[in-house]
A protein has these predicted regions:
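N-terminal capping segments
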Residues: 10-81, 176-178, 185-199
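...with weaker cross-activation on analogous glycine-rich loops/strands in unrelated enzymes
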Residues: 21, 26-27, 76-150
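Aromatic- and glycine-rich peptidoglycan recognition patches
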Residues: 109, 124-199
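Short acidic, low-complexity intrinsically disordered linear motifs used
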Residues: 1-13
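Intrinsically disordered and other compositionally biased segments
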Residues: 8, 41, 90-93
Length: 199
């Protein structure tokens, strides 16, 4: 059984809503930006992400990247990972509790609901794609995605093109600190409009 949000840990003072924990999560994310897979959905980095969700090399790894980043943070903090453990984007979305979901219609009508630290869910031919939101820009957002053009990549998408967003922060202050902590990612990596190749 997974937990509902990081806000529970904030309330228990296991993690803080301040910069320290946001910086730690951002640092984990930053170290992977620009790293490429080796071969087809393989290499040590990809192997580690896929292993975190119980899969072997050769599988698509965008969802495993998201889970793996949060899992690395949770293990460092000694807390359970609240994300559903799966390597499938659409299976992940189906397992996200209703209180953690922001459906597309709500996000389009109120883009302020979309916040840094959330996990976007996007449909694609043959499955889905996902990544971690780091900045919101009106009706668009910037994210860091695994398995985008065979690497960990910075992309920009339209909110209207998503299935929805999963919010496991449930904390405006943590989201704001995470945005600040990840701002250097955007300044050194120009986002690709519409994302990269997803396989």
């Amino acid at each position: 059984m997974y937990l509902k949000s990081f806000n529970q840990f904030i309330n228990e003072s296991t993690i803080s809503a301040g910069s320290t924990d946001a910086d730690q999560l951002a640092s984990i994310l930053k170290k992977y930006v620009g790293k490429k897979e080796e071969g087809n959905n393989s290499g040590e980095m990809v192997k580690g992400f896929l292993k975190s969700v119980g899969l072997g090399t050769g599988n698509p790894w965008c969802m495993a990247f998201v889970y793996g980043v949060f899992d690395e943070f949770c293990k460092a903090k000694g807390i359970p990972n609240p994300l559903p453990k799966t390597g499938s984007t659409l299976a992940f979305w189906s397992k996200v509790p209703a209180e953690n979901k922001i459906e597309k219609s709500k996000a389009v009508n109120d883009p302020d609901l979309v916040k840094p630290g959330q996990i976007f869910i996007k449909s694609r031919s043959g499955g889905g794609h996902t990544g971690i939101v780091i900045k919101v820009e009106g009706d668009s957002f910037v994210s860091v995605d695994g398995n985008s053009s065979d690497m960990v990549k910075v992309n920009r998408y339209k909110i209207a093109n998503m299935i929805g967003f999963a919010d496991f922060f449930k904390s405006d202050s943590l989201s704001a600190q995470f945005a600040q902590s990840t701002s250097s990612i955007i300044s050194s990596n120009a986002p690709t409009e519409g994302g990269g190749k997803e396989v």
